[in-house]
């Protein structure tokens, strides 16, 4: 089963079992909804702890969550600095608009030019500012940085496992 990070518990809040969560998901409303299942990965623990969201509210830049069966600060203190994740079963395709993809769908795809030249595999995605940048590992060469703009990324074909790109002058 694959897990995907949606947030980090940074501290407790009050004495009634609430935790402060910094969201790292684009969909906090659905990921942290009451009744949602989250998996807390603690440092030095091999298996995650399964948690069900009992309440959620936004406070400043945090989400304050409480979990079923964890009514006091003593119950949740152990989760400080835990990473909250969801399984691939919780990822919903209707969260995405046409032309949007989850990072894990893009990483590992082959980058191929419109002329059919294989450039390498996409190894990571950077988010430095206005546009994401897809990093292509090229054998025997330095990494190629592709901005996620329509002029460069022409088509994503998940079934074929490739991304069709048109290199602008200066990218190679």
Swiss-Prot record:
<dbReference type="InterPro" id="IPR036976">
    <property type="entry name" value="RimM_N_sf"/>
</dbReference>
<dbReference type="GO" id="GO:0005840">
    <property type="term" value="C:ribosome"/>
</dbReference>
<dbReference type="InterPro" id="IPR011033">
    <property type="entry name" value="PRC_barrel-like_sf"/>
</dbReference>
<comment type="similarity">
    <text>Belongs to the RimM family.</text>
</comment>
<keyword id="KW-0143">Chaperone</keyword>
<dbReference type="InterPro" id="IPR011961">
    <property type="entry name" value="RimM"/>
</dbReference>
<protein>
    <recommendedName>
        <fullName>Ribosome maturation factor RimM</fullName>
    </recommendedName>
</protein>
<dbReference type="GO" id="GO:0005737">
    <property type="term" value="C:cytoplasm"/>
</dbReference>
<keyword id="KW-0963">Cytoplasm</keyword>
<dbReference type="InterPro" id="IPR002676">
    <property type="entry name" value="RimM_N"/>
</dbReference>
<dbReference type="Pfam" id="PF05239">
    <property type="entry name" value="PRC"/>
</dbReference>
<dbReference type="InterPro" id="IPR027275">
    <property type="entry name" value="PRC-brl_dom"/>
</dbReference>
<dbReference type="Pfam" id="PF01782">
    <property type="entry name" value="RimM"/>
</dbReference>
<keyword id="KW-0690">Ribosome biogenesis</keyword>
<feature type="domain" description="PRC barrel">
    <location>
        <begin position="98"/>
        <end position="171"/>
    </location>
</feature>
<comment type="subunit">
    <text>Binds ribosomal protein uS19.</text>
</comment>
<keyword id="KW-0698">rRNA processing</keyword>
<dbReference type="GO" id="GO:0042274">
    <property type="term" value="P:ribosomal small subunit biogenesis"/>
</dbReference>
<dbReference type="InterPro" id="IPR009000">
    <property type="entry name" value="Transl_B-barrel_sf"/>
</dbReference>
<comment type="function">
    <text>An accessory protein needed during the final step in the assembly of 30S ribosomal subunit, possibly for assembly of the head region. Essential for efficient processing of 16S rRNA. May be needed both before and after RbfA during the maturation of 16S rRNA. It has affinity for free ribosomal 30S subunits but not for 70S ribosomes.</text>
</comment>
<dbReference type="GO" id="GO:0006364">
    <property type="term" value="P:rRNA processing"/>
</dbReference>
<dbReference type="GO" id="GO:0043022">
    <property type="term" value="F:ribosome binding"/>
</dbReference>
